[in-house]
């Protein structure tokens, strides 16, 4: 399929002019990949950190989407993995943000292919479209300051520059790459002299002492055709293979699914290595509004409100005689109490607890590797399992029976299905359920129940305008999620 055909109906992806500016609107490209290991147990492979609420009630992804909305911005384009597409759509809907599109990567290939795919897609409607590459898992407290910085860089980007945003450093950081800013070329915009790899401590101290050097946040503003030209010059293989995969992309339930076999042939590479470090037309805008990649629990602690002793508390948490400690309870049933702790992070969830030296929380990744080696489900899966129709939570799992809380979004439906090894009992506790059991269809309201015999073809739907919640009791010889035969599914699951 030609890209123009794929994009039919997407003409609002880039508007020509904002009433507040002579520049074209900027299309945010929200990069929503990531495996979610460094902030375990809250972030996991099935639900990585960008979708979790670390610093407020909304997720990092939602905060990123809000940060690049409003005057000067077009509707966003989100790039995400297959398993996260419905999470992205749901979280944007909760923000009241209608995306221009959601592009599905069959597998993660790092940021260069994702950026190339977005540029090719945007160029179909407007080759000179301004696009802002935004990692969806960063924290930027001052949203207006960031928007102002983006608008400062927009004239340079419109003239054919690739504009990055250098973060004013607050410490001699060895965990980030750095940028060297050169002479000013436009108001607030400097030529970029070079990218600097993550330094050792001595070099970081030298960089921190010199005002020319900034942190590299991986944020880029450019025209679509400018980025495509940069790929043509510096990484033509990535561009050509991405173009082939995009030309074979197919619409799927409102998403755009990149061709999986062709996408698997694209070289996995970061956009910094593939293009930016070699390009000669890169500029930098200094950003002083505060930024963190939230790459560790220590970073979460640094960005969180603290008491007079440096303690950051979240959920049902209490600190007694503690200093510089992060205590976070993610369960309404767990009271987390720290006594006499210093420089500690403790995160309690219903199925897992992390206790670590706050300054060594980068080692969390090693802990996840250990859990994976043991095939512990907590390494990958949250207690709450998110699905296209809503979510469920396992309350009790014992020999031959299981109890779940199931939440179904308004208008959503589970697949028409049957089970070989279990029967089920459903009790509605909120909302209205439309229930199919073999040839019978009926409505259930609060406190009503139904029995699903083993082997019966069944489905639950929420025909109402409010969430439907029910308790499901399963009984049988095998209770795994793979005991399912699907006959119909509105989300095209097999």
Spans of features found by a protein language model:
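Conserved N-terminal catalytic core of the sugar/cofactor nucleotidyltransferase
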Residues: 16-30, 37-135, 139-145, 151, ...
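Conserved core of the sugar-phosphate nucleotidyltransferase
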Residues: 142-263, 283
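Left-handed beta-helix
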Residues: 21-25, 226-427, 432-450, 458, ...
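Catalytic metal- and UDP-sugar-binding loop of GT-A-like glycosyltransferases, i.e.
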Residues: 31, 134, 428, 473
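Noncatalytic nucleic-acid binding interfaces
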Residues: 470
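A residue-level structural signature of the nucleotidyltransferase/glycosyltransferase Rossmann-like core
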Residues: 131, 212, 219-220, 292, ...
